[in-house]
Amino acid sequence: MNIFKRIKAEIVYSLAVRNADNAHSENGERYYVMPSEDGRLVVVDRRNFSILKRKNYIPKDASVADMQRECFYCTPYRNGKGEMPADIIALKHSAFLDWFAKR
């Protein structure tokens, strides 16, 4: 990946993480940064995940565990537990960069 694509990828990732953190600070829900089929990042919580499943935007057999496994970032739970460790965040960030380079 050249430097300009890398800079764009870092900006896209940081904006998605900031949007997830802002949404979490508003109501305390856990938010996930997920890839979409059109090559963008979406910030989704569990409630919207189930709505998207109901409308068949997401396969019916997808679960919250799948969402946690495939997300690039997630906020902690309302009580503060479940925060992603720094090494997992770095691993997910590198997975995002690989995904961004392939799209």
Where are these predicted regions, by residue range?
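Acidic/polar low-complexity segments and flexible, solvent-exposed patches
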Residues: 2-103
